[in-house]
Amino acid sequence: MMKMVCSSSSSSLLVVAALLAVFVGSAQGIAKVPPGPNITAEYGDKWLDAKSTWYGKPTGAGPKDNGGACGYKDVDKAPFNGMTGCGNTPIFKDGRGCGSCFELKCSKPESCSGEPITVHITDDNEEPIAPYHFDLSGHAFGSMAKKGEEENVRGAGELELQFRRVKCKYPDGTKPTFHVEKGSNPNYLALLVKYVDGDGDVVAVDIKEKGKDKWIELKESWGAIWRIDTPDKLTGPFTVRYTTEGGTKAEFEDVIPEGWKADTHDASK
């Protein structure tokens, strides 16, 4: 699957120094920190340890284009509102972790509030600095601070924190959405799946044409995008069914209309 690397260019010099130390240490025979076990769709009270950095503008949503390796767009706007982050390998899971939600909290430095925030995974990072690493948007990173002390927290550059996976709860009125991606045509359909309540992430997507009984399985393309290549014309309308990591299935009847066009239908029902 196609992957993009999350940039941390706006983190403090402390983070840059830490990364240089990792690379220098590796050259001297010191192993990089290996990733932890994959985080799955299990929920509870247990908190795990992680490190966090930030990237992009200090109060921004991370990527310059407000997108990321999951394929989402406008993550600076509702319902994400910039509360986003890049997960390392056991969190991003080669795109299977896109859309999953996590509570994060920090207790040091003193500017940390100690209160949990909730972030959505929208991007990927490969920095080998901890078994679990969240590279957050500047806005999300600062949100872990006491009111008025956001710059003090961002100034730390890198934080030790605790995290746990939680179920995603989107604002009332937010519905799962299927965006027909650019490049789609009658023989190729690519769907971006987003705003999934509960587990947040999707592990399977199928479509069924109106009047037919057979479900057609889509393949993973990259991030949260699923695709099908077929010699048969895809005319629609199509019912879409997704399966989340925890096994929840949901169907959306005729959500892709007849005569659909690429990059024109951001459809939800």
From Swiss-Prot:
InterPro entries linked to this entry: Expan_Lol_pI, Expansin/allergen_DPBB_dom, Expansin_CBD, Expansin_CBD_sf, LolPI, RlpA-like_DPBB, RlpA-like_sf
Keyword Zinc-finger: no
CDD domains: DPBB_EXPB_N
Any one cellular-component term (Gene Ontology): extracellular region
Signal peptide: 1-29
Domain of life, per lineage: Eukaryota
GO BP terms in the entry: plant-type cell wall loosening; sexual reproduction
Compartments, as annotated in UniProt: Secreted
Family (UniProt): Belongs to the expansin family. Expansin B subfamily.
Stated name of the protein: Major pollen allergen Pha a 1
Taxonomic source organism: Phalaris aquatica (Canary grass)
